[in-house]
Amino acid sequence: MKYKTDDLRISGLQEVIPPDELHREFPITDAASDTVYMARKAIHEILQGESDRLLVIVGPCSIHDTKAGREYANLLKPLMAELADELCIVMRIYFEKPRTTVGWKGLINDPHLDDSFNINHGLRQARSLLLDIADMGIPAGTEYLDLISPQYISDLVSWGAIGARTTESQGHRELASGLSCPVGFKNATDGGLKVAVDAIQAASRPHVFMSLTKQGHSAIFSTTGNKDCHMILRGGKTPNYDAANVAQATQQLESSGQNTHLMIDCSHANSEKDHTRQIQVCSDVAGQIKAGNHNIMGVMLESHLVAGRQNVENKDELIYGQSITDACIAWDETEALLRKLAQAVKARREA
C-alpha cells in the first residue's frame, strides 16, 4: 500500500501574484528611485561615520489603514525638511507583524482585518503606499519577516529591520546579505547581544541559498554580503538604552570587529511596553547624544496620529489613526521628540 505522505496539513492553496507582475502594475518612478537611492546613501554615510546626522525611524507600529499612513506622511514631510541638517528621518512602514502566539499578522497577510487573508490585495496595498510615499520624497523603513515578500517591495525600501525573534534565523541573515538597503538587527528578546553581533557578521559575508525570482521561479541566489548592517538595542528582560548598556554593546561590537554604530529602539522592552515611556527613553538617549556619544547613530520611535492602541472588535468602529498592534505616542509628542533629538545633534557637534 502506498501511503499519502505529503500536504497532510494543507487545507487550501491559492496562487499569489508574481513579483514582476506587481512591479508592472506599480512601477517605480524616477522620483521614487531618487528618494530611495539618496536615503540609502545618507544612511550608509551615517553608518560609516562620514555623516554626524542621526537616523530616525519613526511611524506607526504597523500600517492597517493606508489613508492614515498617507496622512502621517504628510505631517512628517515638512518636519523632515526643517530638521534635515541634523536628522535623517525615515518613516516606519511595517506591513508584517511577528506574533508571540497568534494574532493579526499585518496588512500584507490580512488587509481587510477579517481573517480573509487576501494576500494579493495586501501586496498591492503595500506597494502602492510605498510608491506614493517615496514619490513624496519620504524614505520608508520596514521589517523583513517573510522571506518572499521582499521581492515585491524591497526596491522601494530605504532601510530594513530584522526583528528580535528572527535575528538568529539563518534565512534572515542570508536575506540581509543580499538586500540593497542598510539593515538593523535587534538584540534577542531576552536582551542578549551576541545573536545580533553574530547576525551582523554573518550578513556582511557572501551567501548562496535558494529563493524565488521576480518571475516566481525557484533559483539559486548568490549575494555579495551587506556591509551596512548594524545593531538595534530594543531591551530584553530589562531596558538597555542607558549609557552603561550602550557602552557594553559598543564594546561587544568592537571586540568582534563589527561597526560600533548602533540604533536604540525607544519602544518594546526599552519602554517596558508602556508607550508613554518612549518619551523618557528618547530624552535619555538625546542626553547621551548631547554629551558627545558618537556611537548612537539612530533612534526608533513608534508613533501614530492618535496615542495608544485599540483592539479590532468591529473594524467599522475603529478609531482613525490609532494603532491596532503596539501602543504609539501621538503626533504632537513625536514632533517635540524629533526637535529634541535635532537639538542634541547640534550640541554634539559643538561639544
Put a short name on every predicted segment.
Residues 8-47:
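N- or domain-start disorder-to-order transition segments that initiate the globular core
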Residues 2-7, 73, 86-241, 245-246, ...:
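Active-site-facing alpha/beta catalytic cores
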Residues 55-68, 326:
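Conserved phosphate/anionic-ligand binding catalytic regions in large, soluble enzymes, centered on
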Residues 19-27, 223-235, 318:
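Gly-rich Lys/Arg/Thr-decorated short loops/hinges at beta-loop-alpha junctions or inter-strand turns
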Residues 59, 264, 330:
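Conserved, mostly hydrophobic/aromatic
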Residues 304-347:
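Internal helix-turn-beta structural module
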Residues 47-50, 80-84, 130-137, 222-223, ...:
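Acidic (Asp/Glu)-rich catalytic clusters
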